[in-house]
Amino acid sequence: TESPIPVPAPAPAAKPKPKRVSKRPASHPPYSDMIAAA
């Protein structure tokens, strides 16, 4: 039961990240911060 919980969490987080980077190149610096926070 622990497996299905962590799986859906990283999935939605990975989707909004690439979308923001594609739209705004300035999101690269904050992008690294988001990874470190995660």
From Swiss-Prot:
Cellular component, GO, one term: chromosome
Start-end of Basic residues biased regions: 16-26
Origin superkingdom: Eukaryota
UniProt feature, compositional bias: Pro residues: 1-15
Localization, UniProt: Nucleus; Chromosome
Region (Disordered), start-end ranges: 1-38
Keywords: Chromosome, DNA condensation, DNA-binding, Nucleus
Keyword Nucleus on entry: yes
Tissue: Erythroid cells.
Protein's UniProt keywords contain Nucleus: yes
An example molecular function term from Gene Ontology annotations: DNA binding
GO biological process, one term: chromosome condensation
Main location: nucleus
Annotated family: Belongs to the histone H1/H5 family.
Functional summary from the UniProt entry: Histone H5 performs the same function as H1, being necessary for the condensation of nucleosome chains into higher order structures, and replaces histone H1 in certain cells.
Protein name: Histone H5
